[in-house]
A protein has these predicted regions:
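Charged structural interfaces that engage phosphate-rich ligands
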Residues: 1-211
């Protein structure tokens, strides 16, 4: 585990299991969305049929067993909790009980821009997922607590949060085409002087590219 091929291998394995499960089931889910080994499923055939489907799912492979949560009003999938109440649907940020929120420590030797971008990017994530002002404020408060516990100072946190607050949530929910990156990466072994070396090399490369 931990190698680059692990997610792809797991996805192929679960894709085969998923296909065998759905093709052999007498009753089909209304919808089925899977990300590697996490599944969001909508069921409309009754409780007895659901129990039979789940029992069948756990019989497909001898060592792969599905744990499940069943609810008519609230369900969590990946990092999102969706709640339906009085005909309205809201979304909230979901964190697993095992999540320790171990954000990159400011005491590490990573470039400074990495630490500045984390409060901003995580605040954007909160703003995108949380559909109400109340839950957004609550999750940003949680995020501030986790970041301070990891050693982030108030100035860096507030700067990232302020920058995120200026972005309209509607724009965050729009699909954006991914740009093709044609840059050739320069991969170097880490060295404490890399930042200084970058400051020297970057202007030289910039001049060469303009010619």
């Amino acid at each position: 585990m931990g190698t680059k091929m692990t997610p792809s291998y797991a996805n192929i394995f679960m894709g085969d299991l998923e296909e065998r499960l759905l093709l052999s089931s007498l009753k089909q889910p209304l919808s089925w969305f899977r990300f590697i080994d996490d599944v969001d499923m909508k069921w409309t055939h009754g409780d007895k049929e659901l129990d039979e489907f789940l029992e069948h799912a756990n019989s497909i492979h001898p060592s792969i067993k599905f744990t499940h949560e069943v609810s008519k009003t609230k369900i969590s999938f990946l990092d999102t909790t969706t709640t339906v109440k009085e005909g309205n649907m809201t979304t909230d940020l979901y964190s697993k009980p095992t999540d320790k929120h171990q954000y990159l420590s400011p005491s590490s030797c990573h470039p400074k821009h990495c630490f500045k971008s984390i409060p901003f990017s995580q605040a954007i994530r909160v703003k995108r997922i949380c559909s109400t002002v109340e839950t957004t404020k609550q999750r940003l408060g949680d995020l501030r607590h986790h970041l301070k516990r990891r050693g982030y100072n108030d100035k860096v946190i507030e700067s990232g949060f302020s920058k995120a607050s200026e972005i309209n949530r509607k724009n965050l929910l729009e699909y954006k085409e991914k740009k093709i990156n044609k840059r050739i990466p320069l991969v170097l072994t880490f060295h404490p002087f890399l930042e200084k070396i970058s400051g020297i090399v970057r202007p030289i490369i910039g001049k060469k590219l303009k010619k």
